[in-house]
Amino acid sequence: MAETPESQAALSTSSSTPADKDGSKICILLNATGNVPIIKKRTWTVDPNKTVGWIQTFIHKFLKLDASEQIFLYVNQTFAPAPDQIIKNLYECHGTNGKLVLYYCKNQAWG
């Protein structure tokens, strides 16, 4: 599947787009857990209508993992959201200090 300009722009660094200023995107903080490679840019902005599954796919591609490897996401080190969960809903319920904190790993850690 080829990357489209829309998919490339959907997840960006927190200080790069003017859309951040009008609040149309949600700031997420990605923290590595376990034996997964660390993403140096921890803070990203995401379209609020994206799903957890989309973020998992993005991380998988960004880290250039093998097709057999999985990525698990956890909200605030407590639970694994469903892949079809909308980021906006997670942010409204579990966002702190203007960010949604997500932990990613290659094996199950919590929940």
From Swiss-Prot:
This is Autophagy protein 12-like. There is a cross-link at residue 111 (Glycyl lysine isopeptide (Gly-Lys) (interchain with K-132 in APG5)). Residues 1-18 have a biased composition (Polar residues). Conjugated to autophagy protein 5-like. One of its GO terms (biological process) is cellular response to starvation. One of its GO terms (molecular function) is protein tag activity. PANTHER family: AUTOPHAGY PROTEIN 12 (PTHR13385), UBIQUITIN-LIKE PROTEIN ATG12 (PTHR13385:SF0). Required for autophagy. The keyword Cytoplasm applies. It is found in: Cytoplasm. GO terms for cellular component: Atg12-Atg5-Atg16 complex; autophagosome membrane; phagophore assembly site membrane. InterPro entries: Atg12 (IPR007242), Ubiquitin-like_domsf (IPR029071). Gene3D superfamilies: Phosphatidylinositol 3-kinase Catalytic Subunit, Chain A, domain 1. Keywords: Autophagy, Cytoplasm, Isopeptide bond, Ubl conjugation pathway. It comes from the Eukaryota. It comes from Drosophila melanogaster. Pfam families: APG12. The keyword Cytoplasm applies. Residues 1-22 are annotated as: Disordered.
